[in-house]
């Protein structure tokens, strides 16, 4: 089977975003998340085929929620670690049903969030991401179950032995809370959160491998609609510190 053909331009853009994040922070948390649409959404709320601004609304909402989280900590006299929000996204369509969805990489200060926690904790990063996506979709948060999907990364390779578990590009983790589980409960492969420390070349290469999955040309739609298949943050980015 041929390897996916990657978009070199967007891979270079991601490399630049990663460099900017590491220039601002000693270490970052890289998070892979899939954003999906409800199977049925009344056109009076949003036409998912035409509304290309939904992904922009997601990032604006997430920034606002991070600021509110930081402000709450500051008001409680808790230590606040400022964070930028770097990101890369791609728009894809499922092979079987052709349903539109987004794959996203988020880059945040590791001192601010080193894990996702889970959806049962109102202040967790997982919850903030889900609420931001619901806000972008203009639906109530309680309707967001199953629409935000965090993934565990396993490099594409053949099993080293017949007993080895099969590999896949992205394998789901329940509740997106890989970093809060006991070691005995963890599956093989990398977690939903990748830590990248400044100067760690091996971790940088792992980050680029995750980005390559997003920038493959397969499953992208080129229909002349004018809607973008890719997007990313620009420059170093504003520090979100609750002020």
Where are these regions (language model features)?
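A short, flexible beta-alpha/helix-coil linker loop
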Residues: 38-42, 109-114
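Histidine-centered divalent-metal-coordination microenvironment in nucleic-acid enzymes
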Residues: 86-113
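Catalytic "initiation/cleavage/transfer" segments centered on a nucleophilic residue
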Residues: 1-25, 110-243
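Residues that flank catalytic or metal-binding motifs in active/ligand-binding sites
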Residues: 29, 85, 100, 210
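Solvent-exposed loop and beta-edge segments used for protein-protein assembly and interaction
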Residues: 25-27, 81, 96-98
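Short N-terminal edge-element motif at the start of the domain
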Residues: 39-95
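Active-site-flanking beta-strand signature of metal-NTP-handling nucleotidyl enzymes
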Residues: 28-40
């Amino acid at each position: 089977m041929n390897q996916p053909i990657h978009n070199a331009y967007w891979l270079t853009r991601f490399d630049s975003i990663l460099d900017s994040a590491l220039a601002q922070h000693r270490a970052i948390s890289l998070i892979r998340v899939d954003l999906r649409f409800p199977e049925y959404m009344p056109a009076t709320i949003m036409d998912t085929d035409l509304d290309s601004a939904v992904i922009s609304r997601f990032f604006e909402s997430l920034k606002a929620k991070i600021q509110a989280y930081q402000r709450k900590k500051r008001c409680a006299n808790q230590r606040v670690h400022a964070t930028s929000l770097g990101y890369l996204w791609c728009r894809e369509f499922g092979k079987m049903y052709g349903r539109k969805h987004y794959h996203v990489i988020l880059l945040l200060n590791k001192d601010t969030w080193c894990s996702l926690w889970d959806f049962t904790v109102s202040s967790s990063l997982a919850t903030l991401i889900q609420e931001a996506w619901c806000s972008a979709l203009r639906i109530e948060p309680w309707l967001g179950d199953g629409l935000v999907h965090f993934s565990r990364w396993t490099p594409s390779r053949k099993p080293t032995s017949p007993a080895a578990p099969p590999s896949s590009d992205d394998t789901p983790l329940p509740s997106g809370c890989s970093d809060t589980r006991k070691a005995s409960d963890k599956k093989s492969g990398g977690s939903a959160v990748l830590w990248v420390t400044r100067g760690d070349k091996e971790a940088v290469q792992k980050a680029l491998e995750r980005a390559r999955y997003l920038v493959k040309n397969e499953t992208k739609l080129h229909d002349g609609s004018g809607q973008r298949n890719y997007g990313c943050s620009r420059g170093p980015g504003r520090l979100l510190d609750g002020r």
